[in-house]
Amino acid sequence: AVEKSKIVNGSTTSEGDILIAIPSSGVHSNGFSLVRKVITDYNKEYNGKPISETLLTPTKIYVKPVLAVLEKYNVKGMAHITGGGLPENLPRTISEGHQPVVLKEKLRVLDIFKYIQKEGDIPEDEMYGTFNMGVGFVLVVDPKDKDGVIEELAKYGEEAFEIGYVQK
């Protein structure tokens, strides 16, 4: 069990906190209804292999790197970016009266999402509201902890990066 004082529920997030993204491994398990409408030939080649292989890349498990960060840093909020993408999942981990600000220019959108969007002529807001767009998990931390958290995640092979901040 987790001590009550160590539960990460977003209630301590404050203005200026930093949003750190851990990259996803692909589509994960969300948005396949939309994928099925767009992709009709699963043998079609994509990056030198059938697109089905890319679409079925296993979902990354974030437990070990996130637990390592939790042991060393005061993580104020966490969000696993699943169905609903960043717009639906991030606000749930931010305290009332605050909101997450994601700087789209800082995102590292995976090519598979660009491909799906182009093939299906899907509006950007629908893409961001359906898929993780390359962000699998987000940690909300104090600005002073940002570099240390990113370095800790790197020890686990994660190329984490800042994607935004919390504002009132």
Model regions and ranges:
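Glycine-rich anion-binding loops of enzyme active sites
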Residues: 1-32, 165
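A glycine- and small-aliphatic-rich helix-loop capping segment at beta-alpha/alpha-beta transitions
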Residues: 1-4, 37-42, 95-99
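Residues on a specific face of well-ordered alpha-helices
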Residues: 17, 29, 33-37, 64, ...
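Short, well-ordered alpha-helical segments in soluble proteins
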Residues: 20-26, 39-46, 70
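N-terminal low-complexity, intrinsically disordered patches enriched in charged
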Residues: 25, 35, 92-94
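Short, compositionally biased
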Residues: 32-43, 153
